[in-house]
Amino acid sequence: MPFQASETLDDQLILDGTNGFSTGVISATRPDAIPATSMESAINMDYDDFGNIVSRLGTVTLTGNAIVSNWEDIVDNWNALTSSFGSNLPINASVFSGFYFDTAASERLVIAVNDTSTKTLYYGSPGTSYAQISSSTIDPLANFVYFAQLNEKLFYADGYSSLRYITSANVNSSITAGKISRIDVINQGSNLSGVPTVTIASPPSGVTATGEAIVANDGNLVAINITNPGSGYTTAPSVNISGGGGAHAVAYVSLAAPSKPIYLTAHTNRLWCVSNNTAVTPDTLYFSDLLDGESWDPLGSIRVGGDGDPIKGLYSWFGYKLLVFKERSIWTVDSDPTQDPADWQVTLVSGNIGCSSHRSIAAVGADVFFLSRDGIRSMAQIQAGTQTSVGLALSSPINDLISRINKTKLDLCDGVFWNNRYLLAVPFVTEDPYILGTESEYSLLTENSIDISLEGALNENNAVIVYHSLARSWLGYWDNWIVNDFIPTSFSNFGPVLMFAGDIISVSAASGQVWSFNDYLPNTRLSPVAASAYLDGGATYESSVITKAYNLNEPIPDKIGYSVQLAFDNPYTTQNVPVSVSYAKDMSGTFSTIDPALSITASQKFLKAYNLISKGRWNTIQFKVNTNSGGRLCLQSTILSGFVDSVRPQQ
């Protein structure tokens, strides 16, 4: 007797799944509660131009003891550099900071190099070897160097030594203290028939300053130009105006720049900084004279807030506004250069949200992102509220990742906005326990008087948290990179290229180098970048995606799976991508392999389905797709089908 299907009697096949991962990673909640277009985890994944989730691009090394296999055939111009670029760095040297220094004379990278015995600066550019900058020694205790370019000078500080700068001729120079910074005319005199002679008193030791008078058409002395600022002055010298008709002027002396400067920032043609000297009130903000980072007026400082809350970061915002991030508050200084500094407005932005790392601050479009004590926040988010409200951090969807950051090493965090992505390099604690919340170097003391210390804590950034500004979503994190300092560059021969000082974990023979991110390479759907661009220094890394936990839109009853269909793409006709597919039931986090060696052949839409009937009953099921071959993994969709079991009255 023939069997006839009955829609009223047979179990209905129910569909569930994800047709695109446009809302990114949401990992700080139950995997079955996140949206269908999100995923629980992504490691070393990115968005392509079409919104597909795809492996991030890799890196190539640009300095140090270059390995020829790292360069391969990505770009011919870069291949030619392996024999010369950076080959003169010390064998065991590591690069821990850098800056793209662009002047009218030339463009170059200035990098801070640690060769295990001495920390010093080098300079170089693609096509040339690196050369050491004489007398540019960095303090041995410094973990990084703060750079700020003002005009044709690159100022730098390490938080322990005095302020110095590199000239456009790549020469290290010290700040000349005790020079005349300005001369103000107090009495202009009258009826001057000629230009009077200006004589400035000599210093106790050093060079005597000189100046020349400026007389207006009405016969008044209107200004005195400094022709030589001199040196060695400890107090303001007297100014004698011979034949000045009663004119009188007062000189001002520029003393030494603030001791142990940190957070160097160029803003409104001034240099700004904070002092790392513990004898200085921690909310003191220093600024140089206009257009002169060498000239620091003794009165050129502001106490922001006046409450002792330490300044943790500075950022040059729009207009004349300087953002001052303190540990527990945020302020702006409206430093209009046409006003006297005493008239600048200092305004409170937020009274209970602060910043934890100066180096995490980065402009993201018209917004500014930074790392606070409770996660990554944005200025636009804060301005949308009030000065006293505290909303969720922008990073709340990935709070579990934020909790893994070593709270004793927040100063190491380094952020950059690049190609519509906010990249924040962070020091993850690599082993449990993660959530300790310590903000000092001391261990915690439990109720049982047992010391708890951070296990697996490293003195380096071993992960990069990624936010995509166009998709407005998080992409989990990238690993295999040890990022000491992101260095955005724009060499005229190559265009914009993101580089970073650091290391690649999978390249065991490498020391800390400067690496370039391969996203500058031409890459389209029909003409993709070379497959070797998905390698880090010629070595492979693992990319993986874990989907949400699917429940066929029925949260209570158990289910029996029928099949799952995965959609991939592979634009390479000469290279298959090997991936592994696994599943986990009931949000257990324990994955069992479905297919350990799926080979994705060339196709714009490669479909693969698996039978789930043999996997037994489950309430939720999620899937993990990963590759560690260094190839390009692109997951387009995950479609699940199954049957809903009966609701059990008791179990």
Region spans (language model):
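Beta-propeller and closely related beta-pinwheel folds
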Residues: 83, 88-91, 131-141, 174, ...
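Hydrophobic or amphipathic alpha-helical targeting/insertion segments
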Residues: 142-174
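Acidic/polar residues in short coil/turn loops that connect beta-strands
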Residues: 126-127, 158-160, 166-169, 218, ...
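Long, compositionally biased low-complexity repeat segments characteristic
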Residues: 171-180, 431-438
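Conserved, function-critical positions that sit in or immediately flank catalytic
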Residues: 173-255
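Beta-sheet repeat architectures centered on beta-propellers
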Residues: 1-131, 137-155, 353-356, 363-367, ...
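Predominantly extracellular/luminal cell-surface or secreted proteins
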Residues: 123-124, 166, 201, 242, ...
